[in-house]
Amino acid sequence: MARSNLNVSGIEIANDRPFVLFGGMNVLESRELAFEVAEKYVDVCTRLGIPYVFKASFDKANRSSVNSFRGPGLEKGLQILADIKSKFGVPIISDVHEPGQAAPAAEVCDIIQLPAFLSRQTDLVVAMAKTGAVINIKKAQFLAPQEMKHIITKCEEAGNDQIILCERGTSFGYNNLVVDMLGFGIMKQMNVPVFFDVTHALQMPGGRADSAGGRRAQVTDLALAGMSQGLAGLFLEAHPDPDKARCDGPCALRLSQLEPFLERVKAVDDLVKSFKPIDTA
C-alpha cells in the first residue's frame, strides 16, 4: 500500500504536515539562470520556513511545435541539477519522458516526475517505479481523480510505494483547463500525499497557435483556493521575466513576486491545518 507520509532528504511530505514547495523553473534555459532562480527560491523559503525542493526540466519532450525549445538534454541537464543540489543543499525533482531516462534521472533527482500526458504509459510507469525513487505523478488532463488509483497500483506492483499525486487541471473544451476542488479529497482518500500544480492549471493549451497560453494574473487566487483543501504541497514555476521565458511563460509567476506570493500561501496552509478535522460523511 502507498504511504501517506514520505521523507525526502529529511523533508516530511504528508497532507496533514506543513506544505512542501516543489518550485523552480519550467525548463533549464541556461546554467546561470537556473542558479539565479534556485538562489531566490532558497532565500525566500529559508526566511519563511517552507520546506523546499528545486524543480526544472532537462528536456521538454511534449512541446506544441517541433521548433519549440526543449532544454539541454539528459546529460547536460542532470549535471546542472546535480550542481544545484550540491551548491544549495536542496533536493531535486525533474520529469522523465522515456523509460531509458528513469535510472539516470533517479541517480541525481530525489523525486522523479511522471508527466500528465504520459501518466498511463505502463512501460514508463514501471521503469520509474523500479528505480525506487519517490514518484510525483501528474494527473492527466483527461483522467478523473478516481482513475489515478490504477497508476498507483502499477507503481505498487513494480515494488514502489513512494507515490505523490499532483493535480494540474482538467480539460474543459478546447484550449482551456479547470480545477475541480472536489478532486483533491478523492485523491487524498488514496492514502498518498497530494500536491497542486498551480502553474500548469493556469495553462490554455494551444492557446497561442504553436504554444500554450496562460493566465498568470490569476495565480494567487487559484493557489489559495487549492491550498485551502489541506494539501501536502504546492508545485510552482517562476521566472525573472516570464514574457521572455522559453516555455510556459504565460503561466509563470514573476520571480520578484515569490516572497509575497508564498507568504499568502503559507498563511492559508497554516490556518487550514490548525483546524481539527470533522467528519461530514
Swiss-Prot record:
User: Which InterPro entries does this UniProt record tie to the protein?
Assistant: Aldolase_TIM, DAHP1/KDSA, KDO8P_synthase
Its main localization is: cytoplasm
Q: Which UniProt keywords apply?
A: Cytoplasm, Lipopolysaccharide biosynthesis, Transferase
The cellular component terms of Gene Ontology attached to this UniProt record, alphabetical and capped at eight, are: cytoplasm
Q: Which GO terms describe its molecular function?
A: 3-deoxy-8-phosphooctulonate synthase activity
- Give the enzyme's main class according to its UniProt record, as a single word: transferase
Does the keyword Cytoplasm belong to this entry?
yes
Task: Name the reaction it catalyses.
Answer: D-arabinose 5-phosphate + phosphoenolpyruvate + H2O = 3-deoxy-alpha-D-manno-2-octulosonate-8-phosphate + phosphate
Q: Where in the cell is it found?
A: Cytoplasm
A single Pfam family it belongs to is: DAHP_synth_1
Pathway participation:
Carbohydrate biosynthesis; 3-deoxy-D-manno-octulosonate biosynthesis; 3-deoxy-D-manno-octulosonate from D-ribulose 5-phosphate: step 2/3; Bacterial outer membrane biogenesis; lipopolysaccharide biosynthesis
What EC identifiers does the entry list? 2.5.1.55
Q: Which family does it belong to?
A: Belongs to the KdsA family.
Extract the PANTHER family matched here. PHOSPHO-2-DEHYDRO-3-DEOXYHEPTONATE ALDOLASE
Protein name from the UniProt record: 2-dehydro-3-deoxyphosphooctonate aldolase
